[in-house]
Amino acid sequence: MRWGQTYLQPTDTTCCAQGLTTPQHHARLSANLFLEECDLRECLVIYVDAALDRNGRAGCGLAVFVRGRAVYTESFGFSHIGGSAQLEAHVCAGALDLAASRWPYHRVIVRTDCAPVVRSRMPSSDSFRIAVHEVRERCRRGWRVVRYVSRKANPAHELAREGLKSLSRQQVLAAA
């Protein structure tokens, strides 16, 4: 999963240039999360989410906040073979990679609404264990952590649904 490199067009206004970024999507934090974010002014907070349907289509959403303001958003869809927790772990790992490449000098908090990614001590399946291991390895490389956030408070939730819808629309157009 590679955010920000494979899926953005060169003309997109969301690319980071000297701190001047424009969000691609409208993303907002709830009022109580904004107060929590105020304590993290030196941090980059990345909200991630993934949506998976029963046909193996997935949508991913990402919203990056600095000081409570969205500075970057992205959503896209793709095919996925595997479970939803595994997908969410891969999305978290991709967000950590994006932060390391685009914002290498920021402390990073990745927030996901998938509790098993954050809380699993010994993941059940091999594929999920590998995905969680990828997340933990990326967290060891610096000031990077992954934390739980409720789905209701996750601004990336709607972006993931939007990414899933965009994939469905692309497949309908391709079939026509």
Regions inferred by a protein language model and the residue ranges of each:
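Basic, amphipathic N-terminal segments that precede the first structured/catalytic domain
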Residues: 3-47
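Intrinsic-disorder/low-complexity loop/linker signature
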Residues: 5, 56, 68-69, 141, ...
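Secreted/luminal cysteine- and crosslink-motif detector
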Residues: 16-17, 61, 140
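Short, motif-level signal for alpha-helix interfacial/capping segments enriched in acidic residues
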Residues: 26-30, 92, 132
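RNase H-like nuclease fold core
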Residues: 33-86, 97-102
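RNase H catalytic domain
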Residues: 50-55, 93-161, 166
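Loop-to-helix element that buttresses phosphate recognition and phosphoryl-transfer chemistry
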Residues: 87, 91
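Flexible, low-complexity interdomain linkers flanking nucleic-acid-processing modules
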Residues: 166-176
